[in-house]
Amino acid sequence: MTDIHAQRILILDFGSQYTQLIARRVREIGVYCEIRAFDMTAEELAEFAPKGIILSGGPESVTAAQTPRAPQAVFEAGIPVLGICYGMQTMAEQLGGKVIAGEKHEFGYARVEKAEPNALLDGIVDHEEQGKEFLDVWMSHGDRVGEMPAGFVATATTGSCPIAGMANDEKRFYGIQFHPEVTHTLQGGRLLERFIRELCECEALWTPSNIISDAIDTIREQVGTDEVILGLSGGVDSSVVAALLHKAIGDQLTCVFVDNGLLRHQEGDQVMEMFADNMGVKVIRVDAEDNFLGKLAGEADPEKKRKIIGNTFIDIFDDEASKLQNANWLAQGTIYPDVIESAASKTGKAHVIKSHHNVGGLPEDMKLKLVEPLRELFKDEVRKIGLELGLPYDMVYRHPFPGPGLGVRILGEVKKEYADTLRLADHIFIEELRAAGLYHKTSQAFAVFLPVKSVGVVGDARRYEYVVALRAVETIDFMTARWAHLPYDFLELVSSRIINEIPGISRVTYDISSKPPATIEWE
C-alpha cells in the first residue's frame, strides 16, 4: 500500500490570510501538506520529516522586536525552503541579510522583472519585452529585503522593490515577495509545482483514488469490528463520510438522520431515498423537531444556539448508539478548515470566528469515540472524493449548509413558525436559481429570516409581516467572498414569488455585503 503521507510538504504559518490557500495549491499538485505554527520545535520538525518547507506570509514586520521567526532547524535540515512575502523576509534576516521598511507599499497587481537565472523561476514567464522577461503577480507588503544573505542572488525586481525574489540554488533556499498561491499571480501554479515536484522531488501520490484507499485502511484499522454511528445531514461532508464508511465497513455503519425541524425543503425524504433506498445504507430516521425547538426556546445568542444544537445532536446519537450492541464510534464530517478555524491560532492571534458544529460543540463527557475520515481534507478535495465514490454531481456540488441548519439563518430566537416560513422562502430562491442556470454560478445562496415586521399593503389593507433577506456569494475559497450580482429581473421574480406564495412575508431584501467585513452566514 502506497504511503500517501510519506512525501509531504510542511507549511509554517506566520498568520497570513492566504495560508490555507497555499496548502490547497500544494494538494492540487498531488502532494500532501500540513499547516503548522511557525514556532515548531526542532524535534517536531524532525518527526514530521518534510521533503520541503514553505514559510507563509504574515501581518507582522520583521523589523520589529519580538516578531515571529522560523525555527533555525528549518535552515539546517538540508531540504528546499520557499519563503513567501513575510517568509522571504524572515529567511533573509535569519540568514544574515537585512530587511527594511519600504518607502512605498505594494498591494495588488504588480509586474516583476526577472533577474538572475535560478532553478525556481527559469522558463516561467508571462511577457517578454526588449529581451527582458516579466511575471504578472500579486503583491501585499510594506517591508522589503534591503540586503540579501551571502550566497543569494536577486531573481526578480520591481521599481519599488529591487529584491522581489532571491535564490540560493546550492542550498535550495528561495524567497519571493509576491504570492504564488493566489490566482492573480498567473504563473503561481507552475512556480509551486516547480518547487514541489522538481526541487523537493515529491511524487504526485495525493490523488482521490489513493486517498480513498488510504482512508478505508485507516477506518478498518481504527474501528475494527465495532459499529459506527454517523449523523447524516444530507450535506456534502456527511454524505461523503457515509459513502466512504459504507465502502470501508459495510453494515457496521448505521446512519442516524435527525430531522431537527431546521432542514431544507424535503431534505429528509431526499436523504432517505439516496442512502437507504439507492445505496443500501442502514439509516435510522429520528423525528426530533420538538426536542430541538424546545431547547432553543427563548435563546437568541448565536453561539449558544450552536452549542445547544450540537449538544442535542450528541444526546440523540448517544441514545441511538445505546440501542446498538457494538456502537463505540461517532463519525463526523469534520474537514481541515474546521480544525484550523476552530483552533485559537497563535500565529495570527485570531479569535475563533464561529464555533464549528463539528469540532466546537462536543461535550467533554461524550461516551462515543470519534472517527473523522475527512479531517485532513479541504472542501474541494471532499467533493472530488465524493465523485470518485459515485455520489451524484448535484449532491456533491450542492451549496454548503451549516451544521446547525436553519437555526443560524433565523436571527434571534428560533420558532417553528419562523423555520417553516424560511424553509419555503429558501426553496423558492434555490428553485429559481436552478431554473435560471445560476445555481452553479454562485458558490452559496440561501434565505435568512429576520424577526422584524415591516409594513406592507395587500389590496386596500395595510399589514405588518416579516422580512426575508436573500444572500448569494461568489468565492473560490470561502475565506473571502463577493456578493453575487444577480440580474434585477431575476431578483424581482424571486421576491414576487416569496411575498405572494408564503403567508407572513411582506418584504424581501438582497444582501450586498462582501466577506470581509461581513461573514457569509448571518450568524
From Swiss-Prot:
Function field: Catalyzes the synthesis of GMP from XMP.
GO cellular component: cytosol
CDD domains cross-referenced by the UniProt entry: GATase1_GMP_Synthase, GMP_synthase_C
GO MF, any single term: GMP synthase activity
Active site, renumbered: C85 (nucleophile), H179, E181
Glutamine amidotransferase type-1 domain residues: 8-205
UniProt entry tagged with the keyword Ribosomal protein: no
InterPro entries: Class_I_gatase-like, GATASE, GMP_synth_C, GMP_synth_GATase, GMP_synthase, GMPS_ATP_PPase_dom, NAD/GMP_synthase, Rossmann-like_a/b/a_fold
Keywords in alphabetical order: ATP-binding, Glutamine amidotransferase, GMP biosynthesis, Ligase, Nucleotide-binding, Purine biosynthesis
TM regions (residue ranges): none
Binding site for ATP: S233, G234, G235, V236, D237, S238, S239
EC class of the enzyme, as a word: ligase
Subunit structure: Homodimer.
Catalytic activity: XMP + L-glutamine + ATP + H2O = GMP + L-glutamate + AMP + diphosphate + 2 H(+)
Name of the protein this chain belongs to: GMP synthase [glutamine-hydrolyzing]
EC numbers for this chain: 6.3.5.2
Gene3D superfamilies: 3.30.300.10, 3.40.50.880, HUPs (3.40.50.620)
Taxonomic placement: Bacteria, Pseudomonadati, Pseudomonadota, Gammaproteobacteria, Oceanospirillales
Originating species: Alcanivorax borkumensis (strain ATCC 700651 / DSM 11573 / NCIMB 13689 / SK2)
